[in-house]
A protein has these predicted regions:
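Binding-site signature for planar aromatic cofactors or substrates
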Residues: 1-132
């Protein structure tokens, strides 16, 4: 799957994916997210609340977002593992307000009010959902 195909799948709605992070001790967390957007072939942005994922990303900027689209059989499933590294993490300013406004439009004011920070990631690697 090339990056354009990954971007099409990544940005399809509705879809949910998981974001895996680890703190500086290597303790792993995985959480379900609907807000991440792949804005080009090298960049993912998202809004986040004040939670374990946010704390982990402050300590360790690396993460993996897994996106999956079910098929008729497991062999028909589409998906990718998108390896990420934090570039910007902002709790105010234009980027933050832009992300928050996008979440308000997509999920409502209540969801937007829960956003504590906006994150910009660079994509460091893309791998298939399953490797044989």
């Amino acid at each position: 799957m090339n990056r354009q195909e990954v971007m099409d799948l990544f940005n399809k709605r509705p879809r949910i994916g998981t974001l895996s992070t680890a703190n500086k001790k290597g303790e792993v967390n995985v959480a379900v997210f609907g807000s991440p957007q792949m804005i080009d072939e090298n960049t993912v942005v998202m809004g986040i609340g004040r939670n374990r994922t946010f704390r982990n990303l402050q300590e360790n900027p690396k993460a993996v977002f897994v996106v999956v689209e079910p098929g008729k059989t497991v062999m028909d499933w589409k998906g990718a593992r998108v390896y990420l590294e934090v570039v910007d993490l902002e709790s105010g300013g234009g980027f933050f307000e832009e992300i928050k406004a996008g979440i308000a439009k997509a999920a409502g004011k209540q969801a937007a009010d829960m956003i504590h920070a906006a994150i910009r990631f660079k994509i460091t690697e893309v791998r298939p959902i399953v490797e044989f």
